[in-house]
Amino acid sequence: MLSNFFSKNKLFKSKSSKGDAAISESSQASSISEPAINESHSETEGKKVIKRFLIAYRSVTFPLGFLCVTASCDIQISKKEYVISALLPFPCDGELHELEDKLTDLVHKKVSFSVEYQVVPVRQHRIKGIKNIIAVSSGKGGVGKSTTAVNLAYGLIAEGCNVGILDADIYGPSIPTLLGLKGEKPTSHDGKLMNPLESDGLSAMSIGFLVDDANATVWRGPMASRAFSQLLNETDWPELDYLIVDMPPGTGDIQLTLAQQVPVAGALVITTPQDIALVDAVKGISMFEQVQLPVLGIIENMSYHQCESCGHHSSLFGTGGGERVANTAKTPLLGQLPLDIRIREDADRGCSFITKGSAGELAHLYRKIARHVAAQLYYQLDMRSPTTAELIMPELKSSTANKSSAADLFSEAK
């Protein structure tokens, strides 16, 4: 039984995890009838209260309970605080920070979490250093996919894990601009692998780092697909819990290559509530289903505009579109993001409000969605697609017969 969980698990030595902001998500937790203990109560009684709270706790991130996903958990008492040590399979610093506040109020003594996140690969693959690859897609352009991908990556970092981003939009790369790395060039320590560039702890690679803005990338599908494959496989990625892949809009060669050649753990579909965007989002979901690539959920961007003066929400592109598509596709609606000028301004400047201090409302939204994505990936554990990468497109088979280096590939584009 869960009540015996603590007595059966030894303390796991772990690193401290500090949340940056209290996020309102865990208000969905089950209410606890246990009264707050008075200062006269013993520390042992306080420990019991914490145990009962954790046993009963439920939220969007922990629908089955906190202890159902905790590999190890222990409560230790010191003169100043209770320390809950735990081993968790996905990052959730923001929610743990709120739990610390709730438990501190409950027992009238400081409560803190000391956790280690042990993210494991959902699929086995041969790409060194990367545990899970998440594709961020959209059925059409102009829905804010790339901006969402970047802020989602920063949100995952803020929640406590190591993240990279790969720009798969060979024809219109935007990641260099969004990260403030425009004009930067990758280096190589061995002449074979490229070192990813870094922005505020986010490792990044894009064809935009290799091709000048003034030079159009005029490549046919097979060459673009090969370029993407080499960007992925010939980058010396650090140890990453998640690699976010910003895919080009639509359902073309790059999407098929990614789904069939690369061990993607799951895909996210970005849409707006507008009908014309929803139609294309449905097509994107259908494509992923046909190639047996699991869809983790839908993120609805530009859901509403909030008036800066009175706070009124205006639904400029309609309402409920993302939810309808999610219900039809039987996939979660992971979050709804506003149409906010601050998002656009930061994107143009090449910075993110999440890295500047995660206490704002927008940072809360992106971090909450990041938690939902990480949790959904863990709960889904979808193993339907092949566990090893395999080239299946005839053009790619012929083009890789005489394999060239990344440097050779991009010199061909000049």
Task: Name these PLM-found stretches.
Residues 369-372, 382-413:
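A short, charged, Gly/Pro-tolerant segment at domain boundaries
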